[in-house]
Amino acid sequence: MPKNKKEWLTAIYRILLVLLGTFLVAFGNVGFLAPLDVNAGGLNGIAIIVRHFVKDESMKLLAYNLVVDVAAVVFWVIGLIFIGKEFAIKTLVASIAFPVATWFFSACPGVAGLTAKLGELITYTGNGPTAGNFLMAAIFGGVFVGTGVAITFVGGGSTGGVDTLVFIFEKYLKIKQSIAAFIVDGSIIVTGLCVLLPSDAAFLLPCLSGIISSFVSSACIEFIYIGSQTSYQVDIISDKWEEISKYVQNEIGRGTTVIPARGGFHGDDRIILRIVFNKNEYDKIRSYIATIDPKAFVTYTRTNAVFGEGFKSHKTENIFTKKRKKDGRK
C-alpha cells in the first residue's frame, strides 16, 4: 500500500495508464478487428471464434461481448490459482476495465462512424470488403492494440486475458514469454482458421489479416515499451578519458566508472571509461568523443533496462522479473 502522497500519486498515475492502455486495446478490437473477423489472437480472437456459432445476426454482438466478459474472469481466476495473488492484483484493473471498455465501444456510435470514415474499413459495401479493407483494419487495429498493451506495461500492469497462459507456460514449462505468447496467440489464430475456413473460404482473408495485425501490434510494443526503456552502456579507451569523464559528469549529469586495464597487444596500462546513459543523450556523448579524440576506441552496447541512481528505481521492477530472480533465472 502507498505510504505517502507521492506514492499515492504514483499509484494513481499507473492505474490511469493501465486504464488508458486497456481502453485503447478495446477500441482497436471493437473498432477495427472484430467487425471484419480479423483474428489476431487474444480474447478478441476467442470471441470471434465463438460468435461464429451464433446464427442470429442480431445476437452476434451480444455473444462477442459476453465471451469477452466470461473469458476475462476465467483467465483472472486461473492466474490467481496458478500464478498467485501478486499476479492477480497486477491484472485486476485491466481484467475489469477491458470488458467494460468493450461494452462501451460496442454501444458507442462514434466508433463505427470514425472507422467508416477511414476508407469504410469495417463497412460491408457492394460485394463485401476488399483485401485493402482487411489490410487497413489489420494495421490500424494492430496499432491501437499494440499501443494499448505497451502503455499498460509502462504503467506497471498487464492486460491479463490470455497473457495469463503466457506466464503459466513460463513458470511451469520454463518457456520464454516471447515464445509462449507466439504459441498462445498462434494457437488461437490457427483454431479460428480451422473452425471458420471449412464453412466459408472467405474467412481465409481475415485470418491472414490477423497474422499481419499481430506483427504490427508486436512492433508497436517493441517501439513504445522496449524502446522507452532503452539505455546505452559505452566503454571508452582514450588518452583523453579524464576530459571525457568531466564532460559527462558536468554537462550530461551522468556518473562514470574508471576501470584499470592492460592492452593485450603492447601490454601497456590503459583506462577504460564506462558510462551508462539514456538514448536521448547518445548523440551528445558520441559527438563529444569524436571531437575531442577521433582515435578513441569506443564500444556502444544497448541495454533494455537500467536500475539504480539516475535511472529506474528497483521498486518499480516488474513483479514477473522479481519472480524470475527468485527462481534463479534471468
Question: Which residue ranges define each predicted feature?
Answer:
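Core subunits and conserved enzymes of cellular information-processing
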Residues: 2-240
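Positively charged, small/polar-rich N-terminal and surface patches that mediate targeting and assembly
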Residues: 172, 178-194, 201-212, 218-330
